[in-house]
A protein has these predicted regions:
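Bacterial N-terminal signal peptides that target proteins for export
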Residues: 1-6
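Short cysteine/histidine-rich metal-coordination sites, predominantly Zn2+-binding motifs
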Residues: 94-103, 114-125
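Iron-sulfur (Fe-S) cluster-binding segments and ferredoxin-like electron-carrier domains
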Residues: 86-94, 105-113
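Residue-level signal for mature regions of secreted extracellular proteins and peptides
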Residues: 13, 73, 93-96, 112
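N-terminal pre-ligand scaffold of iron-sulfur
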Residues: 23-92, 125-156
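C-terminal motif of bacterial Sec signal peptides marking the signal peptidase cleavage site
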Residues: 16-19
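Secreted/luminal cysteine- and crosslink-motif detector
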Residues: 21, 81-84, 101, 120
């Protein structure tokens, strides 16, 4: 009986510890500047994704910014292209992957913002890069408001 309890405890401990992969996500609020630009500083972006909340009226539009394992900074809207407009069509990070909370599809962080179409985060197609800054126009970001109208992703 003691052997069974030992192995059961060991199995449960392994089960709970294996679920403790890196899942703490970082959420930040962003705003547009006086020139109607959203400026994202990238020098401190790491392989741990940052989820950036931009508020327009009563809707939160969320962006994912992450540095891939190849060193390239990537950005995308945090809504799944296929699962949207489901309220659960958003991603969280677990280790080097992001996972759709609606369908469970998993992507390596190197794919964030790289693929148009399919079950992955919506690419940010209108952006400019100046040194360590990604610059987006306020009007472009706000044009995605309808995609986030029923969105229920985490914001903090």
């Amino acid at each position: 009986m003691n052997k069974i309890l030992f192995y059961l405890t060991l199995a449960l401990g392994f089960f709970f510890l294996s679920g403790c992969e890196q899942t703490t996500n970082k959420y930040l609020d962003i705003t547009a500047n006086s020139e109607d630009k959203i400026v994202i500083e990238t020098q401190d972006v790491t392989t741990k994704a940052e989820f950036l909340n931009y508020k327009v009226d009563d809707v939160t539009i969320q962006l994912i910014v992450v540095r891939g394992t190849d060193g390239k900074v990537r950005i995308a809207f945090n809504t799944c292209q296929v699962c949207s407009p489901s309220p659960k069509a958003y991603f969280i990070q677990s280790g080097e992957y992001i996972i759709c909370q609606n369908c469970g599809t998993k992507f390596h962080i190197n794919k964030v913002g790289e693929e148009k179409g399919g079950c992955n985060p919506t690419p940010v197609e209108e952006q400019t890069t100046e040194g360590n800054r990604i610059i987006l126009s306020k009007s472009y970001v706000e044009s995605f408001k309808d995609k986030f109208a029923d969105w229920q992703g985490q914001t903090n």
